[in-house]
């Protein structure tokens, strides 16, 4: 459990010491210093104390229980293209043995990564997740060269700010439609079903909005993975 006001250090390959959380991947190569960052799709926030290429230190805004395999969101971060290429090549080599025909690409920032992977694996279906500021800026070309587009509303809102989420979704969906690419809407579509038997009115309205912006697929995750009902 992380307590309100507790100072936590995040980093890749850190030593096992108190108040340290090891990340599975390195921190972003470039970043615009942000006063706050968050985890778990923006649910829990930290005030930034120190941010370098190797460590991120923050003060927790609230008390909460830290669960494994939750994402870290640092607004306005830019990820290294070469590191992304290496990461996905390693994943695809492993998946290729399992005869998997599609792969989701997180934090796609431009179409270069897509063309690079398509050249090496032309038959592989690439699902590009547009979920940060650079990906949103280049979403037209990302939509043009991808096979499928996914909007991760949780990561996207945590990266660009809640106030920009609505217009960002419209922009991405318009470009997906422009190039005739299937659109997946993900994150918190029926989140209350992780605790309740029936969806709320907000859930229903959210699904209606996803339909209006031409979503072809509604993706459920926590709603079905951790339901207590």
Language model regions located:
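Non-catalytic helical/linker scaffolds that mediate oligomerization, partner binding
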Residues: 1-229
């Amino acid at each position: 459990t992380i307590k309100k006001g507790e100072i936590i250090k995040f980093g890749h390959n850190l030593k096992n010491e108190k108040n340290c959380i090891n990340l599975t991947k390195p921190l972003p190569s470039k970043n615009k210093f942000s006063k706050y960052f968050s985890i778990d799709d923006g649910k829990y926030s930290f005030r930034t104390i120190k941010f370098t290429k190797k460590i991120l230190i923050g003060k927790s805004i609230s008390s909460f229980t830290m669960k494994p395999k939750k994402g870290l969101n640092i607004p306005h971060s830019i990820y290294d293209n070469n590191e992304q290429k290496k990461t996905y090549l390693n994943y695809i080599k492993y998946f290729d043995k399992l005869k998997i025909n599609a792969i989701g690409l997180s934090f796609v920032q431009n179409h270069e990564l897509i063309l690079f992977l398509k050249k090496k694996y032309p038959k592989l279906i690439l699902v590009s997740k547009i979920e940060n500021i650079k990906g949103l800026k280049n979403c037209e070309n990302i939509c043009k060269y991808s096979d499928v587009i996914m909007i991760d509303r949780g990561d996207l809102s945590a990266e660009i700010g809640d106030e920009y989420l609505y217009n960002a979704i419209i922009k991405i969906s318009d470009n997906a439609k422009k190039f005739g690419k299937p659109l997946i809407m993900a994150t918190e579509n029926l989140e209350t079903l992780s605790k309740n038997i029936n969806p709320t009115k907000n859930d229903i309205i959210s699904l209606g909005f996803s339909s209006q912006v031409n979503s072809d697929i509604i993706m459920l995750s926590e709603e079905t993975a951790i339901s207590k009902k």
